Amino acid sequence: YTSEGEEYAEVKAQDFVTGLKHAADGKSDGLSLLQDSIKGLAAYISGESNDFSTVGVKAVDDYTVEYTLNKPESFWNSKVTTATMLPVNEEFLNSKGKDYGTPTPSSILYNGPYLLKSLTSKSAIEYEKNPNYWDKDNVKIDSIKLTFYDGSDQESLIRSFTQGAYTTARLFPTSSNFESTKK
C-alpha cells in the first residue's frame, strides 16, 4: 500500500528476492548478519561475483521464496525478520530511484499494520493504523508517536514519563529521581 493507504501491488515472492538484491547492491549494514548464511551472498557483496542469480535466494512461484543456506542454522527464522529481508517491489523501487526509502511517507510501500504519517529528524516519527492491513481487527492501537530523546535531560524525561506524557521511556538508574519510577 502507498502512504495514502491505496493498494499498489500484491506482495509476491520476487519482492523478497528484489529486497535482498537491493540490500546487497546498497551494501546495507544489516548484511553482516546474513552474508555468511545465504549461499553466494558474501561473494556477491565482496564483488567476487557480480551475478546475483548465484545467490541462494529465488522465487519458486508467486508465493514461495526459497533460500539456500551455506549450512543449517537453528536461528535462521529469526534472521528472516530483519529489515534486510523485507520485500521490495521492483517497479516501485525503480520509480523512486535514489529517493526510495528516504524518510518521507511516499518513498516507501507498506504491507504491515501501520503507515508512516510523518518523520521529523531528531524530533518524532508518527504512524497510523493501516486500514487495509489483512489483520486490522487485531491491531488495537490506532496511532503511534515515537519521540526522539537526545539524553541530555534525564530529569525532564522521568518527569514526563511519570506524568503520562510517554507510555515508555528508557530510564537510567544514574538519574537522581530514578527510584521514584520503580513502582
Regions found by a protein language model. Give the residues of each.
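Early extracytoplasmic/lumenal segment of secretory-pathway proteins
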Residues: Y1-A9, Q154-F161
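Short, intrinsically disordered, charge-balanced linker/junction segments flanking boundaries
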Residues: T2-E4, N70, T174-K183
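Ligand-site clamp/hinge motif
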Residues: Y100-P105, N132-S180
